[in-house]
Regions:
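Beta-loop-alpha module in the N-terminal Rossmann-like domain of NAD(P)-dependent dehydrogenases
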Residues: 1-38
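A short helix->loop->beta-strand "cap" motif at the edges of active sites that frequently abuts
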Residues: 15-17, 42-46, 147-148
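Hydrophobic residues in well-ordered beta-strands that form the structural core
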Residues: 21, 27, 47-49, 78, ...
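C-terminal helix-rich "cap/oligomerization" subdomain common to oxidoreductases
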Residues: 33, 215-263
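Rossmann-like NAD(P)H-binding beta-loop-alpha module
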Residues: 57-79
Length: 263
C-alpha cells in the first residue's frame, strides 16, 4: 500500500490538514521530496509518519540510558526482527522496505544521527521460505559517527514474532526485555508466552502513538516523526535494495541536506 501514500498525503497537506501516514511515507525518495516540498510551502509541519516504536516504553528506556551518558557513547547495536511466517505475496524487497524500515527509523531516532552506508548480507536460506524469497537477510548499517548496526530480518522462523535489540555502550550493554509480562515456573520448566504478531508486541505503542497524535491535533501542534524522517528512512531503504541487487556491495546513502524547516 506504500505506493498510494504520497498522493493522499499531498492532498491532506494542500487542504491544510494534519496527517498520520503509515510507514513508509512513500516508496521512492522522489515522492518523499514532493511531500516535503508541499509541506514547506504551508510553513507548518503537518505530516507524522507511523513509526510506532518511538512510542514503545522499552525503546524509550533504552534511549534514556544512552542520552543520560553515564555509560559513554554508543558503539554497536544488534537487532533481530523475526516473524513466524509471511504470505506468498511478500517479496525480498519487502524484507527491507516493509520490515527492516522499522529498525532503520528506530536506529536513527535512538542514536540521533543519520545512517550513511548500508550493505545486505545473505546467510544460508531457510527451507521454510517461498522459492522466490531471500530469507533471512542481515542489514548492516553505519552511522555518521561510526556506530555499527546489524539487523537480522528472519520472517519464516515459525515460533513467534520476536523483536530484539541490544545497544552496546562503552561501559554497559542495554537490551530490550522479554515480550510478555509473566513467566510460568512449574514441573515442566520456566516459560513464557511468545508474541505472534506486531499487534501483540506493540499494541501499547500503537495506542500511545495514536493518542499523542490526536492530542497534538487538538492543540494545533505537530508531534512525532516528520516528513524528513520518512524521507531519510526511504533513502536508506533505497541504498539497501541496491546492495541486495548487487551481491551485498556496500552502498552509500544519498540524501539532500536537511532543510532548516525540519531542524
Amino acid at each position: 500500500f506504500g505506493k498510494v501514500h504520497a498522493p493522499d498525503v499531498i492532498k491532506c497537506i494542500e487542504a491544510g490538514k494534519y496527517v498520520l501516514c503509515e510507514k513508509p511515507l512513500a516508496t521512492t525518495a522522489e515522492d518523499c521530496l514532493r511531500i516535503m516540498e508541499a509541506e514547506q510551502k504551508t510553513g507548518k509541519k503537518l505530516v507524522t509518519v507511523g513509526f510506532m516504536r518511538r512510542f514503545d516504553a522499552a525503546y524509550n528506556e533504552m534511549k534514556a540510558v544512552l542520552d543520560k551518558g553515564e555509560h559513554g557513547q554508543a558503539l554497536l547495536v544488534h537487532n533481530r526482527h523475526r516473524n513466524p511466517s509471511v504470505p506468498e505475496s511478500y517479496t525480498s524487497r519487502m524484507a527491507i522496505d516493509d520490515t527492516a524500515i522499522h529498525e532503520i527509523d528506530t536506529m536513527r531516532w535512538l542514536l540521533g544521527e543519520e545512517i550513511v552506508e548500508v550493505r545486505i548480507d545473505r546467510p544460508k536460506s531457510t527451507t521454510r521460505r517461498f522459492d522466490h524469497l531471500i530469507d533471512p537477510v542481515v542489514v548492516v548499517m553505519k552511522t555518521a559517527s561510526g556506530v555499527l548496526i546489524d539487523d537480522e530480518v528472519n520472517v519464516n522462523l515459525q515460533y513467534a514474532y520476536s523483536i530484539e535489540c541490544e545497544l552496546v555502550l562503552e561501559t554497559a550493554a542495554v537490551r530490550l526485555g522479554d515480550q510478555e509480562k509473566i513467566h510460568i515456573r512449574d514441573i515442566h520448566g520456566d516459560r513464557n508466552a511468545m508474541c505472534q504478531s506486531h499487534i501483540d508486541r506493540f499494541q501499547a505503542a500503537f495506542n500511545n502513538e495514536f493518542q499523542s497524535w490526536i492530542n497534538a491535533v487538538g492543540r494545533d501542534e505537530h508531534t512525532g516523526s516528520t516528513s524528513w524522517d520518512g524521507y531519510a528512512a526511504t533513502c536508506v531503504v533505497d541504498a539497501a535494495v541496491e546492495s541486495l541487487e548487487d551481491d551485498g556491495a556496500v552502498k552509500a546513502v544519498s540524501m539532500i541536506a536537511k532543510p532548516d524547516f525540519y531542524a
